[in-house]
């Protein structure tokens, strides 16, 4: 029999990145805590497919995360710590921190993104996905660790952002391609009250089968003379099932040309 052909590195990555499915009912992850209500509704009611034909930005980020796990070492560091906590209305909030630095009392999350998304996220205010993700980790750490031991950790939350299209000669780019940002942390009771209100509203929408209103900020941008919902077209995996976005709503832009 002929020797079986070994898969190429690219083929292995294609297998690693495939995802298709619907999120577990009544569960929200830390990275979703600041997401628009419509996006959460679609995640609970529709299938999201990261299909076999192309790599998504999330795929590249996942692969890079695996590399960071192997690169950073230290006895005072914990990697990929999964936590979860229940709200009083039965919704589960989960979070997996990329890195916890016990020596410096910091929870670190890696972000791999283009400069445009990096800048836009920091313009979104106190309820931005990044701020709410940090608030979620703080809230989770104040409950229990993975072994069930109450910790009440008062740790800072830092974002380590890797600007994938960084250019030192462009004025709107940061000085370096890797940026570490200390994020403000919500009061834990305030975070919990916000998430209770959000999940109650979400559950009502699900039960009534009524999609929430369109997302407030879809990052409108004119690209090659065409007005594009940037956030929908390039950063939302539910765009093909969103009632406010059609597959032909805007032409695809040449992302490589963006600054």
Language-model segments: residues:
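Residue-level recognition of conserved beta-strand positions in structured domain cores
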Residues: 109-112, 157
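Metal-dependent nuclease catalytic cores that hydrolyze phosphodiester bonds in DNA/RNA
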Residues: 1-107, 114-122, 128, 142, ...
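Long, highly charged amphipathic alpha-helices
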Residues: 63-70, 136, 193-197, 201
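Metal-dependent nuclease catalytic cores in nucleic-acid-processing enzymes
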Residues: 66-73, 123-161
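Generic detection of long, well-ordered alpha-helical segments
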Residues: 54-62, 127, 131, 185-196
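Metal-dependent nuclease catalytic regions and adjoining charged, substrate-binding loops involved
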Residues: 4-5, 143-259
């Amino acid at each position: 029999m002929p020797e079986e052909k070994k898969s190429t590195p690219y083929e292995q990555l294609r297998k690693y990145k495939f995802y298709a499915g619907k999120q577990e009912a009544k569960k929200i992850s830390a990275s979703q805590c600041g997401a628009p209500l419509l996006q959460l509704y679609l995640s609970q009611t529709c299938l999201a497919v990261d299909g076999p034909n192309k790599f998504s930005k999330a795929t590249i980020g996942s692969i890079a995360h695996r590399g960071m796990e192997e690169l950073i070492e230290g006895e005072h560091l914990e990697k990929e710590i999964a936590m979860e906590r229940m709200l009083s209305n039965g919704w589960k909030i989960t979070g997996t921190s990329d890195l916890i630095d016990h020596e410096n009392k910091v929870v670190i999350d890696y972000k791999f993104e283009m400069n445009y998304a990096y800048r836009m996220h920091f313009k979104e205010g106190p309820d931005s996905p990044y701020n709410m993700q940090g608030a979620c980790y703080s809230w989770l750490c104040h409950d229990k660790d993975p072994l069930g031991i109450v910790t009440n950790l008062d740790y800072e939350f830092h974002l380590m952002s890797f600007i994938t299209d960084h250019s030192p000669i462009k004025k709107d780019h940061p000085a370096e391609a890797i940026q570490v940002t200390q994020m403000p942390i919500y009061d834990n009771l305030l975070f919990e009250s916000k998430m209770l209100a959000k999940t109650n509203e979400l559950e009502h929408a699900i039960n009534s089968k009524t999609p929430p209103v369109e997302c407030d900020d879809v990052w409108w941008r004119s690209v090659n003379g065409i007005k594009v919902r940037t956030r929908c077209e390039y950063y939302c995996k539910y765009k093909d099932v969103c009632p406010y976005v059609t597959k032909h709503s805007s032409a695809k832009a040449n992302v490589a040309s963006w600054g």
